[in-house]
From Swiss-Prot:
Family, per entry: Belongs to the KaiB family.
Gene coding for it: kaiB
GO BP: circadian rhythm
Protein name per Swiss-Prot or TrEMBL: Circadian clock oscillator protein KaiB
Matches recorded under NCBIfam families: circ_KaiB, PRK09301.1
Sorted UniProt keywords: Biological rhythms
The keyword Plastid belongs to this UniProt entry's keyword annotation: no
Record function comment: Key component of the KaiABC oscillator complex, which constitutes the main circadian regulator in cyanobacteria. Complex composition changes during the circadian cycle to control KaiC phosphorylation. KaiA stimulates KaiC autophosphorylation, while KaiB sequesters KaiA, leading to KaiC autodephosphorylation. Phospho-Ser-431 KaiC accumulation triggers binding of KaiB to form the KaiB(6):KaiC(6) complex, leading to changes in output regulators CikA and SasA. KaiB switches to a thioredoxin-like fold (KaiB(fs)) when bound to KaiC. A metamorphic protein which reversibly switches between an inactive tetrameric fold and a rare, thioredoxin-like monomeric fold (KaiB(fs)). KaiB(fs) binds phospho-KaiC, KaiA and CikA. KaiA and CikA compete for binding to KaiB(fs), and KaiB(fs) and SasA compete for binding to KaiC, thus the clock oscillator and output signal pathway are tightly coupled.
Superkingdom field: Bacteria
Assembly description: The KaiABC complex composition changes during the circadian cycle to control KaiC phosphorylation. Complexes KaiC(6), KaiA(2-4):KaiC(6), KaiB(6):KaiC(6) and KaiC(6):KaiB(6):KaiA(12) are among the most important forms, many form cooperatively. Undergoes a major conformational rearrangment; in the free state forms homotetramers as a dimer of dimers. When bound to the CI domain of KaiC switches to a monomeric thioredoxin-fold (KaiB(fs)). KaiB(fs) binds CikA, leading it to dephosphorylate phospho-RpaA.
Record remark: domains: Has 2 forms, fold switches to a thioredoxin-like fold (KaiB(fs)) when bound to KaiC.
One Pfam family in the UniProt entry: KaiB
InterPro entries with a match to the protein in the record: Circ_KaiB (IPR013474), KaiB-like (IPR039022), KaiB_domain (IPR011649), Thioredoxin-like_sf (IPR036249)
Length: 104
């Protein structure tokens, strides 16, 4: 049986190259590489350069992390430094636990 892994599609909205934006991106990349290496796509959107994208996606504050796929869409606004809160907020931690339990 072939086991296809899900691909996680995420968007990180930042406002320029501020220390807060750089920290959010670095922290997020660490989490994704540790937990979802090879099965994620991350798009970083600078709302100062692309305000229309922020408006279309109803982004009101930065940094905002949005999980697009797999559904449902989830968003985290603000501090991304707490690994567990990020995973829980995006419904990724519980999803992985459920999958592991179903394999038992």
């Amino acid at each position: 049986m072939v086991n296809f892994k899900k691909t996680y599609v995420l968007k990180l909205y930042v406002a320029g190259n501020t220390p807060n934006s750089v920290r959010a991106l670095k922290t997020l990349k660490n989490i994704l590489e540790d937990e979802f290496k090879g099965v994620y796509a991350l798009k970083v959107i600078d709302v100062l350069k692309n305000p229309q994208l922020a408006e279309e996606d109803k982004i009101l504050a930065t940094p905002t992390l949005s999980k697009i796929l797999p559904p449902p869409v989830r968003k985290i606004i603000g501090d991304l430094s707490d690994r567990e809160k990020v995973l829980i907020g995006l419904d990724l931690l519980y999803e992985e636990i459920r999958e592991r339990e179903s394999e038992l």
